[in-house]
């Protein structure tokens, strides 16, 4: 056990990105050029590939609005005329209203929830060939890196036809219909709006597996890439706070806020020690309903109120934070705005506990 040995460290490898086949690019561009009413579905692959500019060039040439997955939030600023926000599973005019989108360009998304597609043709771009057409049959797949493929698609599109006339007025009306028909629930809607109003536009929100996190996927506007982080399909409890610390280390000059439930936060609450030890001044908002909220709601509503393993006996979160040397604050929903503004102004790791009651389902 006390021996010393030399170890050869391996050099990091730059794994080559797949380059889309020329013929697939040409065929995909032709399909998009022929589409009367195209729509772009942008996923996290846009963010990973840093393909925002290439995406926007294609969208503006086609006058195709962009809807994002939660992982793709930030692929386009939600103030852009072509931005429709994130898709909703139900009651979404993008799916229900005419004229229907006839061709979908899906980039960097598994299309795991294609429930609102109604027979449209899909041109799917993905770096993982196994994902092409896996969740939706009527798919023309292009295997390649998002940025490189979008750049090639754009080069082909400009050769096929000039840029289309602006449809800004039409899409503004669609955005308005989406806003008017959205199923908004309280207190989630007010809380998410408060957090957005307090955070700077380039601030980073980590969306934990909690009622506020779920709701933020559709209703937290994002204006820059890599400013909305989520555990995606994995749905990990305990994800939010450690990721917030990593984000703050990577971007020390940006505001970093994690939203977490009480149950999820307790998976990694000991990382308060890390934050204090290394001066990582991220903010975590713990929404405390003394339960695994989703599980408890389902047990009450679907299993005749038989509650098992969903109610929690929690610590005093303010004292817990203070025991580690962090700032601890307790704030009601109506006090959250001031508490968050103060936390972002203070040069110290901060936990804000917000006591809440059981919330209605955000999955609408």
Protein language model annotation of sequence segments:
Residues 127-159:
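Short alpha-helices
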Residues 44-123, 223-253, 268-270, 301, ...:
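Glycine-rich, anion-gripping cofactor-binding loops and their flanking helix/strand elements
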Residues 20-27, 33-34, 322-361:
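Glycine-rich ThDP/TPP pyrophosphate-binding loop and its adjacent helix/strand module
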Residues 25-38, 58, 98-100, 194-201, ...:
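Glycine-rich phosphate/diphosphate-binding loops that line cofactor/substrate pockets in enzymes
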Residues 1, 71-73, 98, 100, 106-124, 300-339, ...:
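Conserved thiamine diphosphate
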Residues 1-34, 183:
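Conformationally flexible catalytic loops at phosphate/diphosphate-handling active centers
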Residues 171-247, 253:
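Active-site diphosphate/adenylate-binding microenvironment
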């Amino acid at each position: 056990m006390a021996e010393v040995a030399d170890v050869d460290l391996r050099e990091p490898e730059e794994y080559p990105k797949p380059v889309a086949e020329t013929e697939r690019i040409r065929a995909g561009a032709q399909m998009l050029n022929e589409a009367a009413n195209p729509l772009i579905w942008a996923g996290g692959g846009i963010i990973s590939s840093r393909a925002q500019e290439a995406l926007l060039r294609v969208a503006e040439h086609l006058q195709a609005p962009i809807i994002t997955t939660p992982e793709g939030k930030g692929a386009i600023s939600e103030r852009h005329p072509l931005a429709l926000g994130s898709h909703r599973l139900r009651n979404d005019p993008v799916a229900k209203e005419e004229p229907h989108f006839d061709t979908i360009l899906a980039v960097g998304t598994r299309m795991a929830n294609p429930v609102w597609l109604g027979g449209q043709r899909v041109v799917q771009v993905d770096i993982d060939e196994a994902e092409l057409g896996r969740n939706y049959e009527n798919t023309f797949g292009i295997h390649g890196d998002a940025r490189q493929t979008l750049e090639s698609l754009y080069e082909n599109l400009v050769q096929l036809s000039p840029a289309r006339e602006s449809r800004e007025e039409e899409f503004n009306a669609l955005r308005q219909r989406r806003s008017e028909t959205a199923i908004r629930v309280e207190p989630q809607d007010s809380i998410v709006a408060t957090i957005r109003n307090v955070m700077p536009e380039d601030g980073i929100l980590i969306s934990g597996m909690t009622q506020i996190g779920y709701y933020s996927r559709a209703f937290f506007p994002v204006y820059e890439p890599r400013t909305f982080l989520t555990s995606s399909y994995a749905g990990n409890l305990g994800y939010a706070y450690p990721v917030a610390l990593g984000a703050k280390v990577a971007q020390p000059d940006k505001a970093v806020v994690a939203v977490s439930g009480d149950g999820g936060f307790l998976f990694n609450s000991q990382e308060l020690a890390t934050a204090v030890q290394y001066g990582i001044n991220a903010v975590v908002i713990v929404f405390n309903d003394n339960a695994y909220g989703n599980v408890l709601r389902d047990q009450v509503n679907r299993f005749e109120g038989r509650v098992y393993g969903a109610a929690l006996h929690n610590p005093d979160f303010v004292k817990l934070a203070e025991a580690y040397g962090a700032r601890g604050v307790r704030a009601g929903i109506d006090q959250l705005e001031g508490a968050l503004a103060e936390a972002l102004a203070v040069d110290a790791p901060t936990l804000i506990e917000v006591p809440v009651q059981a919330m209605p389902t955000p999955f609408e």
